[in-house]
Every structure is written in structure tokens, then in C-alpha cells.
Amino acid sequence: MTEFSPREIVSELDRYIVGHAEAKKAVAVALRNRWRRRRVPADLRDEVTPKNILLIGPTGVGKTEIARRLAKLAQAPFLKVEATKFTEVGYVGRDVDQIVRDLVESALAMVREKRRAAVKAKAEGGAEERILDALTGPGSTAARESFRKKLRAGELDDKEVELQLADTGGPSFDIPGQPGAAVFNLSDMMKSLGGGRTKTHKTTVSGAWAPLIAEESDKLLDQEALTQEALELAENHGIVFLDEIDKVASSSQRSGADVSREGVQRDLLPLIEGTTVSTKYGPVKTDHILFIASGAFHVAKPSDLLPELQGRLPIRVELKGLSRDDMRRILTEPEANLIRQHQALMATEEVTLVFTDEAIDALADAAVAVNGSVENIGARRLQTVMEKVVEEISFTAADRGGETVTIDAAYVQERVGALAANADLSRFIL
């Protein structure tokens, strides 16, 4: 779990996302409160529940990007799901309990990776012995030592070996009517009966290291303790980002078949409030899982959500639409901005791509103009405009090695000016 202060979290998010100070503060405080709760006296710890957040803002302003960056920062089990993927219990589709099961899988992967790193040195020794067994056979000590030296020197990396590895890719199937038994894997069942199957793999020595180290690490790990730690991590530090929550809100203007829209909201209520969900690793309490919901609310309004669900998302943050200045900053400020990405792509062909300040202004103007005349899709419009501008250069770059190509305002106008000005053309091309 990360120990960044709220200010550090915000400055970390600032490296990738332009503006939205209020939203960044809200998620930073929510993340820090997880750390604070662990230090509260034990009698109060269970009473301190996370304050769930609802992010409201037009499409393309950075709601999902905030979640993506937060996931990397949090160092906690994190799951991003679209609310539209779920259906009410009784309909064909995934039920909302699957969110918790996926979160547990994410926690399990995190804990396993951490534990594997701790036993990696020992596991490498076991993997080396198995590769030597495959190369020389179990006996022959003298030949084995000579091969060991060559193996460590990397001289045998391209040699092909045949290995017996655990078979993890057995067929999976659903068991209807079984709560928490969403998907069973035949290999898992065989393993639990004490008969784990193996499969012969042909690979090079260099390709054999990763699967062998993973397998040897798992032999050294206490699987039961690992599962318990993962369940505890998911319960106390899990974060779920529910995207497109507005798509399951029933708009007052929309009539007709409302298949399981409200039902999904009703199913989400106990999950967000706190319930116990059965998973194949054991029961998981959701009382302390942090939920961050987000939606554009173009058609529906936040008030169209069930009142009980609104009450369970107490912190509301509105993200403003992007201005022309924001668009310009998005092109230049984030660490992996679009201009830098395209320059790096062209550099692989030994073409130096230069954007003048006027060209950057023209790109921002074109994106704002098209957003205003057609559909406002926020910063995503910049990608469309940028692709149109560099299309010809990308196509001919392979034949222009060593050249420096300067993109100025006139070039941008030539490529997208007419399209941006003509609403009908923009509708289909930009």
C-alpha cells in the first residue's frame, strides 16, 4: 500500500493529467485515508468506512485516466470495470458479485508476485537444476558441472530443451446456480485432488527460465497463507473504479424496456454498502473496499440514479470540459504527451519531427473547433486531429531517413483546416 501524502499523489497525477485539481484532491484524500485507517485504534478501525466518490464530467476530460494512474500509484488491488457489463441477477450476463471475485484475483496476483520475488534466488537454483536435468539427464556429475558453467555464461541460451511443466490451461466451465463458483478450472480441481497434471513443453533454454522460476517459486510458497493475505488485502485496501455508471441510470425521458438497468443499481447497493461475497478462495467482506464511480451523464442526470445509491457515493466531484488552453497544455505538458510520442515514433525511422509553437496552437484550435461543431469528445479529439496531420509523414518516413521535418501552422491548416471548418466533413473524417 502506498504511503504518499495527498500532496505527493496530486503532484504525481499532475505529471500525466492536465487540470482537474478538485478531482485529484478527492482521490488523493480517499487514498490517504486508507493509510490513516490502518493507524487508527483497533476499536475504531471497523467503524471507519471509505467515503466513495462519484466523478461527473463530459467524455474525454480524464476521468478514466485518473483511475489508470491511480492504479499504478496505489500499489493496492485495483479493478476498473464498466457498469454496462453487468446485468441484474436472473438475466443472462455477469452479476455484480463478479467485481469482488476479480478484485480478489488481482490481489492474489499482487501477493504472489511479491512472495515470488522474496524466494527468487532459491527458485533460480531449482530452475537451474531442472534445466541441467533436461540437458544432461539426472546422473553424470562431470558433464553436469561443465554444462552448468556454460549455462551460467549464457552459451546454451539457444539450445532447445524438453521440459515437464504443470498444466494450467485446462478447460473452464460455469456451474449454474452456484454462488461464488462463477468459473471452475479443471486443472485447479485435479490439483486439489492431489493429481496435478503435467505437460511436455519444447522451448529454448532462455525461454525456459521464466516458467521454471515461477513453478519453483510456487513450490516454495505457502499457498494457504498467500490466499489469506490476498483476501485481507482485497478487503482492506481494494479499490474498484466503476466506469460508465450513468449508462445504468434510467433517464426520466427514456421509456420502454429497461432490461435490468435499475436492477444493476439495486445489486450494486449492498456491494457498495458492505456485504459478504463468496469466492472460490473464501468469503470477502466489502465494507472497506473503496468504490470510485464515474460517468459523463449526458442523457441521464446523477439524480436519476437510485436515491440509495446516491447516498452511498457521498463525495461528488465535477470535472469541467476542456478549454482551448487545456488542449494546448495536454499536447505539451504530460510526460508522455502526443507530440513526444509521435517524435519518438519518427525517430525510429531516423526522421526528426519538429512542431513549432504556432503548429501546437493550430492543433488545439482545430480540436476545439471540431468538438464545438460536431460531438464533444474532449481530449480524444486531439488524437484524431494529430493522426490526420502526421499521416503523410508517417507514410513516407521509411524513405526519408536523416531528414528533419518541421510542422508549422500552415501545414496543420493545410491538413485539417478545411475539414475542421466544414461540419459535414468533420462529422465523417475527424
Swiss-Prot record:
**InterPro entries with a match to the protein in the record:** AAA+_ATPase, ATP-dep_Clp_protease_ClpX, ATPase_AAA_core, Clp_ATPase_C, HslU, P-loop_NTPase
Where mainly found? cytoplasm
Source organism, top-level taxon: Bacteria
One GO CC term, this protein = HslUV protease complex
Q: Where does ATP bind?
A: 18, 60-65, 243, 308, 380
What keywords are annotated for this sequence in UniProt? ATP-binding, Chaperone, Cytoplasm, Nucleotide-binding
> Sorted alphabetically, which SUPFAM superfamilies does this protein's record hold?
P-loop containing nucleoside triphosphate hydrolases
Instruction: Indicate where this protein resides in the cell.
Output: Cytoplasm
Q: Which is one GO molecular function term here?
A: proteasome-activating activity
GO annotation (BP), single: proteolysis involved in protein catabolic process
Assembly with partners or alone: A double ring-shaped homohexamer of HslV is capped on each side by a ring-shaped HslU homohexamer. The assembly of the HslU/HslV complex is dependent on binding of ATP.
NCBIfam families for the chain: hslU, PRK05201.1
Its family remark reads: Belongs to the ClpX chaperone family. HslU subfamily.
Q: Report the function annotation for this chain.
A: ATPase subunit of a proteasome-like degradation complex; this subunit has chaperone activity. The binding of ATP and its subsequent hydrolysis by HslU are essential for unfolding of protein substrates subsequently hydrolyzed by HslV. HslU recognizes the N-terminal part of its protein substrates and unfolds these before they are guided to HslV for hydrolysis.
Protein name stated in the entry: ATP-dependent protease ATPase subunit HslU
> Which organism is this entry from?
Caulobacter vibrioides (strain NA1000 / CB15N) (Caulobacter crescentus)
- Gene expressing this chain: hslU
